[in-house]
């Protein structure tokens, strides 16, 4: 309302979650004063606010490297927000109650993600504990899923490939073993009976000591397809990480090994298997080229894995704004060729969520770029600044935006070469 004229905004969408996204977009426009024409003219106002939004990729997922004991691998913002001990199950392990503090924290988490269009969350570390597949944790995951669902967020779980053997149900984890296949089929049935909209599994296999099909002279396709068959009846997906080195190609340049490992399997995966690959071929370095696997895999759907947490970029001690780095990546890898974008989360139970006051900007930037990779790093920095600090004075925004925009290059200059 301005100049005694009241305006109305209409939000339409194809589903209820779309309406929620639209409401958050309107709030963003208001908070950033994006439609201020300076004239009070209704025609100009209507033109400014008339827009249609559609996400570039379907899967926009946070990957939490959170362990069941509350620790976080590469976490720099306290302990995990998923306080499993604060979820109490009812009789026979069903039902469940949750502490008010955890419930409130998860609601805030869900709202923050929904405001960015993030629609998935992998709750646990890719270096996964087999305990994640027990009935106790599956029922606790249900409690979290029920909280996130109204905000359009589906839950996923990382799995330990050797779970049936580690939990004592089979003598092997060979993906071609009938008993192993049956165990995963029953486990998938159990999970989907508990959480009908469960998203699927994220898998780190035969990488950095994790078990996998290679332990039994089987291929990644053998392992992924076995799991894919188990979740297929329920609409689930398998996100199989290509971060594999030192298994079958020892001595070869590490940056080539993902292609060497997976290229010959391209086209041999089930249609609900997606290869998830880090943006660079080495390991989330401050500057490295885009991973060649994005050029070499033609028939298998792919997800790009970005790292929001600053493992090699100052952890949560340094201001390092990562949107320029991700824009550099998308300048080489066309997002239209991807089915999803995942981000290794930088979230913890610190009061400010991300450790460093400016690290929230990277969570925000990930969500905005996953929704619309054509946004500029400058636009996103400005959006985050004026919404976070509620200050649109250019005497504040201009120097701080410049500090953000130059921070990644500064980090490269003092972190590189390796």
List where the protein language model places each region.
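Short small/polar-residue motifs
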Residues: 1-2, 352
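Feature activates predominantly on carbohydrate-active enzymes
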Residues: 2-185, 189, 193-202, 232
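Solvent-exposed loop/turn segments at secondary-structure junctions
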Residues: 16-18, 68-70, 127-129, 161-164, ...
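Short acidic, gly/pro-rich beta-turn/loop elements at beta-sheet edges
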Residues: 21, 72-74, 133, 165-167, ...
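Substrate-binding groove of N-acetylhexosamine-processing glycoside hydrolases
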Residues: 48-51, 193, 211, 218-418
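Hydrophobic faces of well-ordered beta-strands that scaffold small-molecule active sites
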Residues: 60-64, 110, 121-123, 155-159, ...
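Active-site-proximal beta-alpha loop/turn segments in soluble metabolic enzymes
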Residues: 165-174, 204-215, 243-253
